[in-house]
Amino acid sequence: MDVTYLENVPLDGPFTELELHWSGESSGPRFPLTFNQRNHLAAVAASGRPTWIGGTLGIPDGVPLSTIAGAVRSVVGGADALCAVACGDDQQEFTADQLSVIPGEVRPDAPAAAELESLVAGRCRPGRVPGLFFATCGDVLLFGIDHFHADMLSVALLQRRLHDALHGRALPGAPRFLDTVTAPRPAPDDAAIGVWRRFLDTTGNRIPAFPVELGVAGPAPASPVHDVRRLLDDPGQCTFAVILAGLAEAVEPLSGSAEFPTVIPVHTRGRRGDERHGTVGWMVGNAPVIARAGDVETTAGWLRDAVTVAGLPLETMIRECAPELPDGAVPMVSYTDLRRLGTPLPQARYVSATSPTDTVQFWFSRTVHGLDLRTKYPDTPEARQVMDGVLGGLERALGGKSLSPGR
C-alpha cells in the first residue's frame, strides 16, 4: 500500500459513484463516544472542514458494478464502526439491513482533482448517516471514510476485505469496535504516566510544537505542501529508531538542539496476535518520544517505552499531567511497516484529506519496495526553506551511514 494523496492517484476510465442509502434512523443500544471521536467532532464543528481518510484498490477484470456494490455492502455492513453515527454524547448503529448500495450515473471520466476532493469531503463528514464514499473509476475502487469511523490500519483491513469480497471469498470475523468502547478500563498505569512525566520534564511540561519557525502568520493555518518521496529502495535494518535518530540529525542544524521531542501515534489493539488487530475503528493513542541526533540506542529506548504508554488513554494523561498544549496542531511522526499486513494488493493506496496546516507531519511507511515518506507542511517561504533542509538532511542521514539495529 502506497501512502499518498488523492491528487497523485491516476484515475482513468468511466467513473461511477456507489451510492450508500440508509433507511430509517440509527437505533439500538447507545455507546459512549471515544476521546478521539469527541475531539474530531469538535474540530469539524469549529473549522467546518471534514477530515477523512481512505484508499484505493484494484478491481479484478470482468467484475460487474452490481457485484462491486454487493461487496461494498457486505464489507460496510460487517464493520460496526462504519455503521455508527454520533447522537449527542453517544453513538448509535444502523443495522446492515438498513443499508443499500446502488451504482449511480456512469460518467465517461473521473472528476477533476479538485471536484473529486470536494465530492469525497462532502460525503465523508459527520451527520445523520455514516460519512462514507465509494466509487469506481476504470479498474480502481476508491473509498473515503470520515475519520470518526476509522484509522489508517482500518483502511488496510477494509482493502483486504473488499479484495476478498470481490473474489467471492468469505469475510473474516473480528471483535466489534463498539464493544471495545465499553470494555472495562484499567486504572491509570504508573509506569505509563511516568514515561509522560519524564518527557514533559524535558519539554517544560509542554506538548512541543515543531522546533523551527514555519512562517504561519495569525491564527489561521496555511495552505499545505504535500511531499511524497522514496527515501530508500533497500532500507536494510532501517527501523523506526534509525529513522527518528536521522530525523533529529536533520532538524538539529535548524533547531540548535540534538534532541527532537515529538508525539507518535500508537495503536491500541493490543500486542501482536491480539484478535483486535482485525477490528475496524479508530483505535489509536499517542506516545511521547525524544529522538536524539544520530543516537539510535537512546531513541530506541523511548520507542520501547511507547509500548508501555500505548494503552493509556490520552485524556487520562492530560488529567494527570496537565501539560500545556500548542496553539495549533500537534506535529506528528508516524511509522507503519506495511509488509506486516500481508501480500501487497493491486493498486492499494492510502489517501487522506488535504487541509490547511500550521505544523509539520511525517508519515513513514515501509513496503516491499523500500522506505517511503509523505510529508505535509505549510506553504510559506519559511516552511519551504526549512523543509528543504530537513528532508535533504534526512536523506543524507539515512543514506550515508551504516544503519544500526533498533526497535
PLM region spans:
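Flexible, Gly/Pro-enriched loop and linker segments at secondary-structure and domain junctions
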Residues: 28-33, 50-56, 82-87, 122-136, ...
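Secondary-structure transition/turn motif
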Residues: 93-99, 145-148, 375-382
